[in-house]
């Protein structure tokens, strides 16, 4: 069976390291699907869900708040400031953070504050969407 080694790393820790049959994640130009022996690639990724299909057919989900993807024929590396295992996502915390980002958006006093609030809101919306996707798969 052909597999590819996958590493998902946050600023604090390694979130996932193992073999996979397939990886799907949100690239800047759209959804990316990666199989073993994929053409080398480096690109930015958007906030969203990384879906890792394991050799036994099970799936692992990881939320990433954007980052960098490096693909080699036998290895996929996802680097993200924030990466959370699907099973560790907390709906209440995500909803609270989204509400705080919406409030910050309303109260933004400068272009920088506005951009920061918009970015945080986009990340939290993506995290909530990833949480829903994870729950549907369970």
UniProtKB/Swiss-Prot annotation:
Function (record text): Produces ATP from ADP in the presence of a proton gradient across the membrane.
One Pfam family it belongs to: ATP-synt_DE
InterPro entries found in the cross-reference section: ATP_F1_dsu/esu_C_sf (IPR036794), ATP_synth_F1_dsu/esu (IPR001469), ATP_synth_F1_dsu/esu_N (IPR020546), ATP_synth_F1_esu_C (IPR020547), ATPsynth_dsu/esu_N (IPR036771)
Keywords carried by this UniProt record: ATP synthesis, Cell inner membrane, Cell membrane, CF(1), Hydrogen ion transport, Ion transport, Membrane, Transport
Membrane topology: Peripheral membrane protein
Underlying gene: atpC
Subcellular location: Cell inner membrane
This protein's name: ATP synthase epsilon chain
Chief site of localization: membrane
Organism of derivation: Acidovorax ebreus (strain TPSY) (Diaphorobacter sp. (strain TPSY))
Known partners and oligomeric status: F-type ATPases have 2 components, CF(1) - the catalytic core - and CF(0) - the membrane proton channel. CF(1) has five subunits: alpha(3), beta(3), gamma(1), delta(1), epsilon(1). CF(0) has three main subunits: a, b and c.
Gene Ontology annotations for the cellular component aspect, listed alphabetically: plasma membrane; proton-transporting ATP synthase complex
